[in-house]
Amino acid sequence: MESGRNLRVVKSDSPVRIHTGKPENLPERLANRALGMKASEIRSLFAVASRPEIVSLAGGMPNLSALPMEMMASVTQKLILENGAEALQYGSGQGHPKLREQICDVMALEGIKAHPDDVVVTTGSQQALDLISRIFIDPNDVVLVEAPSYVGALGTFKQYEAQVVHVAMDQDGLIPSALKDAIATTKSAGRKIKFLYLIPNYQNPAGVLLPADRRTEILDICREEQILVVEDNPYGLLGFDKPSPNAMRASDSENVIYLGTFSKTIAPGLRIGWALVPQSLKEKMVIASESSILCPSNFTQLVISSYLANQPWRDQIASFAKLYKDRRDAALSALDKYFPKSATWTKPGGGFYIWVTLPPEIDTNALVPKAIAAKVAYVPGTAFYADGFGTWSLRISYCHPTPERITEGIKSLAGVIKTEMESRQIN
């Protein structure tokens, strides 16, 4: 062994290992923003919920049984054989020009007239949320969100040290008067609001649809108060009963950033989403994206582009919507049949989720182990609040299991809840 004042080199048959005199405590070096990082409750449940004996009503995994796999295989093979050199090379930081044109065609179904130059392709819409947060949020800035809100957005905002303020919802989504109150209260406290984040169509986690008149009123409020709107729309094309209203971006191209994704309408494993941004913000978005990922995957962009060019994709989306409608119907029927009468729940017209409200004495976090023992998984309501609110609520995801498994899972969950209510003499 050779040694120096602060360094020891241990020689052995294995590769050389270098030791400092004192073991490092690496967690002490973490940045402040990293100290509060933790896995989302959904991710923490994933390992358990993915066990085959568990009926998972937890994660929002799209059901890919309606995806034409043979066609996807053919598209991919043809792409590699005929255009592999481009597909497997680095690409534009803003995204492939052809796909950006096609994305504009997709958004046209939501009433949006967009130019490809204003589209920034991202690694899923989750990366778009990260980019928006990075270029807008300073520590302690306020972000307004729905109550409840998407857990992935809450985690991103927290990572950038934002203060999240929840705005009340009802069965028709965000309440405009509550938004006015939240803005007034926040501004009177001398705090800076950076943007409003919302999911107008079949909201995650509540499943509710924001009506057209509320969209207009919310846009008017935000324009008057000079607050940017971030409109996240993963589920807008997956309506069951009637088309959703036009996107908010369709009415305001200057004060709305629109986020879209192919995760729900094609497949999440391709990891392609996008942001439609006001022209004044595009350069910063592209620079921020290039600094973290260089460019979105050229390969998966071109797979999607070929799919859109060669597949009747509107019909395919309709097939997905029919699949999810059947599962929604099974979930609502099971809730009506098995859940206690004191429980209430939303009745979504599209998307993946149902929001259940139980008597306030019930703690859905405490019930998770009992539900797992009964072979069913769900997400407690507190996951969707930044402040731990919502202990008596939970989210049911009906997108992935079969209708029969959904019925089985909801029946089991109802049994767990009823047993808890009986043991605590809750009506």
Regions found by a protein language model. Give the residues of each.
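Short hydrophobic/aromatic beta-strand micro-patches
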Residues: 276, 355-357, 397-399
